[in-house]
Amino acid sequence: MRVILFDLDGTLIDSAKDIALALEKTLKELGLEEYYPDNVTKYIGGGVRALLEKVLKDKFREEYVEVFRKHYLENPVVYTKPYPEIPYTLEALKSKGFKLAVVSNKLEELSKKILDILNLSGYFDLIVGGDTFGEKKPSPTPVLKTLEILGEEPEKALIVGDTDADIEAGKRAGTKTALALWGYVKLNSQIPDFTLSRPSDLVKLMDNHIVEF
């Protein structure tokens, strides 16, 4: 195993409150406050369009995506923070020589901005978003293209995420997969190769050679 790919929301960072805040402002601007859900976290993971489609259903309009992005870009890191142990885990993996990358369904620019503000971007060899390659997870394309840029084969890679989209993308790309149980965890049909209760479990997984190097 030479490269580890990370999802962003619900894996590296807890961004639920800021996403909920942007959604609240969006619905208020559109006069659709009554559609604000009780639990925003269950809609996170597929990107802005998917979030709004699930929340608004037949009331969704394409132009609402930009309204949400406007509000989110204004304040992307009010409450957002890395999960406990994430900085330690990234530091430990980097010191062991692993290539690290972020494969998010968020916009690339926004993903980079958030990681910069949180002082995490320096750990990663590559950061890509849902708009980088024209396809989002669960498509395997973002995973395969990221590995291609890094010069690595899928068999030498592990993807860590908290949703079906992450696990399916990894499996379709031919990587090993690990479910981040500390995240928003939306797993239905996909079965990961590994489950991680806390970020530091990933370091132990590598140290114990459970995954062949």
Curated annotation (Swiss-Prot):
Its needed co-factors are: Mg(2+)
Q: Where does Mg(2+) bind?
A: 7, 9, 162
| Family matches, as InterPro entries | HAD-like_hydrolase_sf, HAD-like_sf, HAD-SF_hydro_IA, HAD_2, HAD_sf, PGP-like_dom2, PGPase_prok
> EC number(s) on record?
3.1.3.18
Keyword Aminoacyl-tRNA synthetase (UniProt): no
Protein's pathway: Organic acid metabolism; glycolate biosynthesis; glycolate from 2-phosphoglycolate: step 1/1
Query: What positions constitute the catalytic site?
Result: 7 (nucleophile)
Q: What cellular component GO annotations does this protein have? A: cytosol
Swiss-Prot/TrEMBL keywords: Carbohydrate metabolism, Hydrolase, Magnesium, Metal-binding
Key word Chaperone present: no
Q: Which GO terms describe its biological process?
A: carbohydrate metabolic process; DNA repair; glycolate biosynthetic process
Q: Please list the reactions this protein catalyses.
A: 2-phosphoglycolate + H2O = glycolate + phosphate
Which residues of the sequence carry a binding annotation for substrate?
38-39, 43
Q: Which family is this sequence assigned to?
A: Belongs to the HAD-like hydrolase superfamily. CbbY/CbbZ/Gph/YieH family.
Role this protein plays = Specifically catalyzes the dephosphorylation of 2-phosphoglycolate.
**HAMAP family (UniProt xref):** GPH_hydrolase_bact (MF_00495)
Quaternary structure?
Homodimer.
The molecule here is called: Phosphoglycolate phosphatase
State the organism of origin.
Aquifex aeolicus (strain VF5)
Name of the coding gene: gph
